[in-house]
């Protein structure tokens, strides 16, 4: 697998470069792992920080059959961009207006009787039949119809089908252990899901597709594929089970900036607010023009590393709102103002990765890639740079 060298876009101070070729590679791999089941690529939260429209197009080009988002507004943004593929939205607060979704052909995920009632109001107002997926709670105790309320939900669905108000497209649930494919709770959830699918059939509600698998299960539990899988983080090349390595996935995002300033300081001089770092010898510093307002976590001060000219350099001192400092070491500096600094990327050239940041922060790489903002401009490399 070949990845072309990274270079900063001219005129851009800092950027999150998204390699659409990596997205396509990852989705092709997920399609292979799905073993005949369809793939719904999840592009919620603006494509996990990668850009929902661009990543959706890349995922569809690579073989994804459908798209998944959290909110109706996210689905409508895809429609506004000209994406006509099936889109499912499943997170709805009280009082939501489902009419624009119905008019745009967006599929609606339902987790309660209240949501169904509000949807049926929109059906009457628009004259459009709603295509629905019922989300059931199999143990996460978050979004989804609880088992105790499921029988009455099925009764209401059956009545709505008889009135030609809805088409029952799918049954879905969400897994508790996103990064532990062997956890026995996964099997408990799968059995509950299977039972609820059978219960629907017994009550005369027949769903066209059922889907439970997240990224982890798609990559490692083919027995949980049902009719469709619903990967999220793996679409973007981040391993759903970091302990198992990259699993053949290629991280799509690289965050980088220009070196704004290079300067020398003497031994004993200190850096940034609070002087938390003091030079032990004469050294050179590079100033990078991004900070915590741009998604560079303040808690990484004095802990992160940055790759400049093929070498990792330690960050020193506190990270500020819009800048931080790295130590280039003594002697004649081998870094010049205007050089490229890579904060994290795929790691193929030795640069830090999103997983490295997650490990330092005690969090997950999902949080890292959804954090770049502010003055970090999102840019794209077209889908011809990664080869399977």
Swiss-Prot record:
<dbReference type="Pfam" id="PF00842">
    <property type="entry name" value="Ala_racemase_C"/>
</dbReference>
<keyword id="KW-0413">Isomerase</keyword>
<dbReference type="InterPro" id="IPR009006">
    <property type="entry name" value="Ala_racemase/Decarboxylase_C"/>
</dbReference>
<dbReference type="InterPro" id="IPR011079">
    <property type="entry name" value="Ala_racemase_C"/>
</dbReference>
<dbReference type="GO" id="GO:0005829">
    <property type="term" value="C:cytosol"/>
</dbReference>
<dbReference type="InterPro" id="IPR001608">
    <property type="entry name" value="Ala_racemase_N"/>
</dbReference>
<comment type="pathway">
    <text>Amino-acid biosynthesis; D-alanine biosynthesis; D-alanine from L-alanine: step 1/1.</text>
</comment>
<dbReference type="InterPro" id="IPR000821">
    <property type="entry name" value="Ala_racemase"/>
</dbReference>
<dbReference type="GO" id="GO:0009252">
    <property type="term" value="P:peptidoglycan biosynthetic process"/>
</dbReference>
<comment type="similarity">
    <text>Belongs to the alanine racemase family.</text>
</comment>
<dbReference type="InterPro" id="IPR029066">
    <property type="entry name" value="PLP-binding_barrel"/>
</dbReference>
<comment type="function">
    <text>Catalyzes the interconversion of L-alanine and D-alanine. May also act on other amino acids.</text>
</comment>
<feature type="binding site">
    <location>
        <position position="142"/>
    </location>
    <ligand>
        <name>substrate</name>
    </ligand>
</feature>
<dbReference type="GO" id="GO:0030170">
    <property type="term" value="F:pyridoxal phosphate binding"/>
</dbReference>
<dbReference type="Pfam" id="PF01168">
    <property type="entry name" value="Ala_racemase_N"/>
</dbReference>
<feature type="modified residue" description="N6-(pyridoxal phosphate)lysine">
    <location>
        <position position="44"/>
    </location>
</feature>
<dbReference type="GO" id="GO:0030632">
    <property type="term" value="P:D-alanine biosynthetic process"/>
</dbReference>
<feature type="binding site">
    <location>
        <position position="321"/>
    </location>
    <ligand>
        <name>substrate</name>
    </ligand>
</feature>
<dbReference type="GO" id="GO:0008784">
    <property type="term" value="F:alanine racemase activity"/>
</dbReference>
<feature type="active site" description="Proton acceptor; specific for D-alanine">
    <location>
        <position position="44"/>
    </location>
</feature>
<protein>
    <recommendedName>
        <fullName>Alanine racemase</fullName>
        <ecNumber>5.1.1.1</ecNumber>
    </recommendedName>
</protein>
<keyword id="KW-0663">Pyridoxal phosphate</keyword>
<feature type="active site" description="Proton acceptor; specific for L-alanine">
    <location>
        <position position="273"/>
    </location>
</feature>
<dbReference type="InterPro" id="IPR020622">
    <property type="entry name" value="Ala_racemase_pyridoxalP-BS"/>
</dbReference>
